[in-house]
Amino acid sequence: MSGSTITPWVVGNWKMNPMRANANQLIEEFKQLLQQNQIADENCHVGVAPVSIALTTVQAQLQDAARTVYTVAQDVSRVAGTGAYTGEVSAELLKDSQINFVLVGHSERRDIFGDNVEILKAKLQNALNAGMTVIYCVGESLEQREQGQAEQVVLQQICDIAPVVTAEQWQNQVVIAYEPIWAIGTGKTASPQDAQAMHAKIREGLCQLTSAGSNIAILYGGSVKAENAVELAACPDINGALVGGASLNAASFYQIVQAFAQSK
């Protein structure tokens, strides 16, 4: 069951980059490209995920962009509300700053910082209950792929979160991002055929979990570049991209947005 009628998303994950002056320049250059070559909001959802201390600054800079560009948090606390939790930022605090979108489950959070299933479920549930839209990341390692376990691993990651997501939240607040771990920041990319095959399996799994399965956007993340964006965008179940390094270059990021906006 294809998701080809879904409005695509392109989200730039800046990770722990860049310094403030470079971030300001990056946003201004991207805004200029949007002004010169406008892409309608209805053709593609666009977001950028800066470091947490830059969220409101970037959001303010984007207010006068020629189209809507969402500001996305890279992470959220597993603890809700407010309280004595040094270093944490809750979903409610993000919402209070008009940050309505968040990444949860990125492989770097899982692998480097120990975000396990229970932690991710808590983060996801808190964000959804606060009214945020969550881009939930799933993906397999190279070892898991080589052992023929890729589909099983990815589908299990989605099934793991099903108990904390309501039918209405699946419909309105969840985006899935498939990021093969072996392709992140390595320059390696799953072939469009391999990526589409996995996205089709994810779509099938989502349709078994929820009646909203055919309407959930599934993004590809794994060394997405301007050079491969058109091919990826042509795949029926690839509904956008979670872009890493290429989003730190305004021209490259714009070309990726353009590729997906023109594909559907």
UniProtKB/Swiss-Prot annotation:
Protein name, per record: Triosephosphate isomerase
Gene Ontology molecular function: any one: triose-phosphate isomerase activity
Annotated localization: Cytoplasm
Swiss-Prot/TrEMBL catalytic activity: D-glyceraldehyde 3-phosphate = dihydroxyacetone phosphate
Lineage, top ranks: Bacteria, Pseudomonadati, Pseudomonadota, Gammaproteobacteria, Moraxellales
One Gene Ontology term, aspect cellular component: cytosol
PROSITE patterns reported for this sequence: TIM_1, TIM_2
Keywords from the named record: Cytoplasm, Gluconeogenesis, Glycolysis, Isomerase
EC number per UniProt: 5.3.1.1
